[in-house]
């Protein structure tokens, strides 16, 4: 299996399976002499860690990260940084019923069609367990970016229930189990998702990621576009089925006058009157907040029987038991933040290499 790496100058390779002994990643291209320790990475992993509420999988994994290389006396050395998380709460027996049966909507059938073999235990390589290492890599990327770039994410929609942007409060995001920026929507989601969970079903969601402090000039025309790389990175997250930058698909309903981001010089500085573009024009950052949204589909592991087939071609029904996220979008918030951080770190280094600091 190829294509387990992404990035150019800041390059991340992840490895491991859901029910293997460990998962890990190698971060290459990190500049030397940056302060880094496990304590800098662990808080970001703790935000994604499973089993923290009844609305996520009850698999209990501490997700304790270990730095194996690339750091000496608390500083990066410029050599590859190897990170490891040991799996401790695998329960492979829960997947015995699907060893020969495909879950409709799950990647296991595509893996089997391509490779002729698949690890059915928890989804193997296609499991969202892999995203823990993206979050770890994202913590390293934040060190590269420094404190001047701030990346935040929030869940904006579960099913048909959307937040009210007039009530948006970033300070509320980490005070509830949903990363919800609208305090009034939290009890609505609790009741709704509680019913979904009790029914053994699942539901999709929309996540928004915003990066502030990104200077103008990151990204390159045509094939090195910042938004193109960001879309690829977010699309690579498990269960993601759609991406928007700025107004995204809503821009198709706007006139040229409505979609324009007016510009003025204020105290010798370029300012914008709106941000429909989401902080990117021509693939290059404008200095405005970088805004991206992505949609995740419902988890394919559900209790209700669904028509499927076996590896041998027999028509069957599949009902999936075990520990699963009723809404995988919740824990996708810190994953989306991490992917944004990795893309920005890569483009920061690429920009510096081409035009200097």
From Swiss-Prot:
Enzyme class: lyase
Role this protein plays: This reaction introduces a second double bond into the aromatic ring system.
Stored Pfam families: Chorismate_synt (PF01264)
Positions contributing to NADP(+) binding: 48
Family to which this protein belongs: Belongs to the chorismate synthase family.
Gene Ontology terms describing biological process: amino acid biosynthetic process; aromatic amino acid family biosynthetic process; chorismate biosynthetic process
Pathway(s) annotated for this protein in UniProt: Metabolic intermediate biosynthesis; chorismate biosynthesis; chorismate from D-erythrose 4-phosphate and phosphoenolpyruvate: step 7/7
Annotated positions binding FMN: 125-127, 238-239, 282, 297-301, 323
Recorded GO MF terms: chorismate synthase activity; FMN binding
Cofactor: FMNH2
Descriptive protein name: Chorismate synthase
Reactions it catalyzes: 5-O-(1-carboxyvinyl)-3-phosphoshikimate = chorismate + phosphate
Gene3D superfamilies: Chorismate synthase AroC
CDD domains, A to Z: Chorismate_synthase (cd07304)
Keyword terms, alphabetized: Amino-acid biosynthesis, Aromatic amino acid biosynthesis, FAD, Flavoprotein, FMN, Lyase, NADP
Subunit text: Homotetramer.
């Amino acid at each position: 299996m190829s294509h387990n790496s992404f990035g150019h100058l800041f390059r991340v390779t992840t490895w491991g399976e859901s029910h293997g002994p460990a998962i890990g990643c190698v971060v290459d291209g990190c500049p030397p002499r940056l302060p880094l320790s496990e304590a800098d990475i662990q808080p970001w992993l703790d935000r994604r860690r499973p089993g923290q509420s009844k609305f996520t999988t009850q698999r209990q994994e501490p997700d304790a990260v270990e730095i194996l290389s690339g750091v000496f006396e608390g500083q990066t050395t410029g050599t590859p940084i190897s990170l490891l998380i040991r799996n401790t709460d695998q329960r492979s027996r829960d997947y015995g019923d699907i060893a020969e049966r495909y879950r409709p909507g799950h990647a296991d059938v595509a893996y089997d069609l391509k490779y002729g073999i698949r690890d059915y235990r928890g989804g193997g390589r296609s499991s969202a367990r892999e995203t823990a290492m993206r979050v770890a890599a994202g913590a390293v990327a934040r060190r590269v970016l420094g404190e001047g770039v701030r990346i935040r994410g929030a869940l904006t929609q579960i099913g048909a229930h959307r937040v009210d942007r007039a009530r948006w409060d970033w300070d509320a995001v980490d005070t509830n189990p949903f990363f919800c920026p609208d305090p009034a929507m939290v009890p609505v989601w609790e009741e709704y998702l509680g019913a979904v969970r009790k029914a053994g079903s699942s539901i999709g969601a929309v996540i928004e990621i915003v990066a502030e402090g990104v200077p103008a000039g990151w990204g390159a025309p045509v094939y090195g576009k910042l938004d193109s790389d960001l879309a690829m990175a977010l699309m690579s997250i498990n269960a993601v089925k759609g991406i928007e930058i700025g107004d995204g698909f809503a821009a198709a309903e706007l006139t040229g006058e409505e979609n324009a981001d007016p510009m003025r010089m204020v105290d010798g500085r370029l300012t914008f009157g709106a941000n429909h573009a989401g902080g990117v024009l021509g693939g290059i950052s404008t200095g405005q907040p970088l805004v991206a949204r992505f949609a995740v589909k419902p988890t394919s592991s559900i209790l209700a029987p669904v028509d499927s087939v076996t590896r041998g071609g027999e028509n069957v029904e599949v009902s999936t038991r075990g520990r699963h996220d009723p809404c995988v979008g919740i824990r996708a918030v810190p994953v989306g933040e991490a992917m944004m951080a990795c893309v920005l770190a890569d483009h920061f280094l690429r920009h510096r290499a081409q035009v200097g600091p």
